[in-house]
Amino acid sequence: MQQMTPRKAAVLSLNSSIKNGKYTNLELDAAIKKYGFEDKDKAFFTRLFYGTVERKITLDYIIKRLSSVKFEKIEPLVLCILETGLYQVFFMDKVPDSAACNESTELVKTICPKAYAGYVNGIMRSAVREKQTILDEIAHLAGSFGLSVKYSVPEWLCKMWQADYGESREIVKALSRVKVGVALRVNTLKISAEELLSHIPKELEAKCVGKTSIVIPRSCIVTELYGYDEGLFFVQDPASTIVSSLVNKNSVGTDKPFVVDTCSCPGGKSFSMAINLGNEAEIHSMDLHENRLRLVRSGAERLGITCIATHECDGRKPLTEYFGRADAVVCDVPCSGLGVIAKKPDIRYKTYAEIEKLPEVQYDILEASKNYLKDGGFIIYSTCTLRKAENENVVQKFLDNNKDFELCPTGIFGDETGMVTFLPHKTGTDGFFAAKLIRKK
C-alpha cells in the first residue's frame, strides 16, 4: 500500500473540503488525526493545505493564464494538484521548483487518470519558467481586480470595503494572511494575566494585552497549555473581550444584575461577562441549538462559573417570562464573519448571495431582544464582520423604529457615538463592530 505523503494529503483534504462543504479547520484536524504525520510532515501538510486555501484566487489566476483547458472544465482533483503545486513554486521558497513539478506530476498518476500527467507537468514547468514574469504582472494589476488577485480576496469584497470604509487595501492586507496563533481570555476570578503568562513557554512568544488577555502568535495546542483543565482561561479574541467588558459592575449599576446573551454559543461573551461581574449575576445564555448549549455549560463548569443558565431559544422568538427584567442584553448576532477571515480562510470565498439576507435576520433578533430590557437597561449589538449593511445600517433601522432607544458612547478607543468598528490594521484585533443602545427611562 502506498504511503500517505503530506502533498497527497493536502490535495485529498482540499478536494474533500470543497466537495463536502466542510470547514477547512475541521478538514485539517481530521486529516492530521487520520494520517498521524510526524512533526515535520505535519508542519509541511498544514502550511501547504492552509496556504493553498489562503491563496486560491491568486493560484487560480495563474492556472487560467497557463492552461490550455478552460478553467471550468479542469477536473477537481487535477485542479487541487495544480493549486498545491503552484503554491509550492510561488510561496514556499524552501521547496525546490524541480521537486514541486516532479511531485505534482507523480501525484496525478496515483489519484487521477494518467492522461492528465502531461497536462499538469506542462503547466508546472511553464510556471517555473515564467515565474518572475507572472509575479511582475500580478504586482502591476490595478484596481479592485488587482487587489483581489494579489491578496486572494473576492473582488466584490474589495469593492464593498472600499465603499464602506474608504480603505480597502489596508483591510485586505490585514485580513488576507492566515493567523495561526490564538488569543486567551484570562479567568481573573482565579489568576492574573501576568501570572498565567509566566507559565506559558517562552518559545510561544506570548504577551499580555491589557489586564485580561494573552495573545500567542505561535501555533500551539490550547488544551495542553498550563491551566486549561483548571479553568484559568478560555479562547477569545481581544476584540470580543473588549466588547464584553461593556457589561460590568459599573455599567449595570446593581449588585446582582440580570443579563441576557441572546446568541451565546460557544459561550465566550457569557463567560467574560460573568467574570466582569465577579460571578455574582444572573446570566441567561440562549441559542437555537441544544447541542451547542452543551459547550456553554461544559465551559462554565471548567471555568468555575456558576451564574449562567442556558436556554434553547430562537433569537427571533424571545422567552416571554423574561420580558422587562434585564439590566443588559447582548446580541452577538449571526453574521458573515468577514472580520475573521484571517482565522477562517474559507469565509473569504462566500458569495454575496450567501450573505445578502443576513441583515434581515440580525434586525429581527435585535428587535425581539429589546423585550427583555427594563427601562434604563442597555443592549450591546455586535458582529465579527466588516460590512455596514450588517452593522451601522441594522442599528440605524432599529433606532428609526424604536424612538424609546438611543445610542450611548461605548468609550472603546475613545468612541463617543455609540458605534465602534474594529479595523484590524488599526486595532491589531479581529474585524469587529459593536453598538450600545440604551432604553430611555
Where are these regions (language model features)?
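S-adenosylmethionine
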Residues: 1-441
